[in-house]
Amino acid sequence: MLEELKEKVYYANMELMEKGVVLYTWGNASEMDRNTGYVVIKPSGIAYESMRAEDMVIVDLNGNIIEGKWKPSSDTATHLELYKAFPEIGGITHTHSTYATALAQAGSSIPAIGTTHADYFYGEIPCTRSLTEEEVEGAYEKNTGLVIAETFAEKRDMILHTPGVLVKNHGPFTWGKDVAESVYHAVVLERIANMYCITSFMQKNTDMPAYILKKHYLRKHGEHAYYGQT
């Protein structure tokens, strides 16, 4: 079932390791097939080096295993809440990449202060609030997804224009139209976080004019985008 999608999700997860944003068994990526309502996701605790496409797990939106010999990622419920909250999202990635996670631990959002940021994220990359003790002791992973959705509640139309978030005390989640795009955004987010940390060390108070942010984002993603060969 969904053999091509399992291959796609497998290779997307492997790219996380190849790009250096995950170690050991850290991180996970998934994609939802909106036709069946099923999600293909990395198995829990399986080392990337030994993982194969057939190890990917298929679950429904209630978290029931539809196909697979392993348990799905421990973060599955977070992915599912995001798929339910935002139908535009087709793929999700979670990592513990160094700089993005450091900022999440600090509770720091990432303001748009440079054009690299503006090329991919239209505005600040937000950091969520901390989960309450009740949220952590209850359905922790589900509540993580709900807190992310809460963070975008008043700007849900920006969900694909700001395709990532830092979960306070935890780490980054990114998304896109499919799993490949969500992985791409995870790699880019880590580089942006790196640049922001270095810039903040050099210059505490810096910003970027809104017109530069708008120009760089829209030349790549706007109605009249002209970046690339399309």
Explain the meaning of each model-derived region.
Residues 1-230:
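Glycine-rich flexible loops
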